[in-house]
């Protein structure tokens, strides 16, 4: 009996020790992580967990018994909630989600790095610039779309595309690559060139660029679908060039990379195009992953801003998903529809593009759709592909589920487990270099008590406010007289996000001065437009 009890206790002790060791291994090193020199944050727009799972099966080699891992499987560390500010409920749009990732602040749907009171809040890229780092964005949408705009600028509505484009003159970003020619007039481009930017409209010219600053506008709006130009690998090419250019700064860099069109394909409920966009994004991640291996001072964080489309791998109660159908498709349904409308004998071209021959009944349905024009035929082709692959969708909009977080490099363990999307921003901002302090001024001789009384009596409220702002500037900005990208006020949470003792002390002193009676000045107004007006096709 005693032996049995002793054995049980020993087994229990061994289990507890084993569990403790397992937890330690799971959580990683308990010592504080090292601070990276460079940060790359990559956003798969609309890339919910179903997309990464579907991509795994899409990439699976059917000739092997094993299902091969993808870059997403290798780098997975956690997940994140995505809800916006309470005024917008539980389901976010891209602008509010990007604001959370860029600033650590929840806001209303449609807002571009302004809070719910429409006041600008400082972004990761702005703070990096203030610390002497280089910054850049590479995207497959227009560069003034919701996600890149939230990292670069501020506006009460994501729909103010022209205003956002103009505001980029003040960002001082070193690299901006994507689409958006439509929103940059010749006059505006001339202003960028006057500020030293090389402005390109042909992606092939990127090879000749050897230094920042560069702005690439490679399409009227978004870049072409990856499925229609699979050899272009534009996001990988732009990302590699951005890394090359930004790494010229010894102070480090912060780069945003977005696979923008995953979301657009999801809104269209277009599984074939979505998987091609996932492949494009995965290729760009692998470019950065390789860079991280070669530059061990670089942190990579990958996530999504939200889920799009309610993608379902299998539907109608049938336990099947045929990825082989998708791998054979060599053009987007939009492109297939255009070609079918341009030809009298269209059936052969459709079969060739789909990689399979529709049945007579399916051809009859497509023919009826063709009679109604390109949009109806495109929808018919997408439904046919969904039926053949057994893919399901629940919406043409966004859903409110959590998204995955992937990371590699120094401090990547910070992103393990569950977190909110604002936590990702807080962690990234805390990893930026410490703000450069201004040189201390020589202390003045202390006046006598009578003189102090006179000074206290005559000091006005505006002077107290000026002292507070001067103190903030001297503690936060790189140079004593440097002008911040936006007005930085205590309610922006800039200081608490930095997690710097000196900065917190500066905030406390500034707030004490402000409490003497000075009122904060309001920030400059942003363009007026309905903040909730955003079409699904480009959310």
What are these regions (language model features)?
Residues 24-31:
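Cleaved targeting-peptide boundary
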Residues 34-39, 50-51, 56, 117-131:
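Active-site-adjacent structural elements in enzyme catalytic domains
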Residues 89, 93-116:
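A glycine- and small-residue-enriched flexible loop/hinge segment at structural boundaries
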Residues 106-166, 172, 180:
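Extracytoplasmic mature domains of secreted/periplasmic and thylakoid-lumen proteins
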Residues 446-469, 475-483, 487-489, 493, ...:
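Asparagine/serine/threonine-enriched low-complexity, disordered tracts
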Residues 476-479, 483-539:
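Long, low-complexity, intrinsically disordered segments
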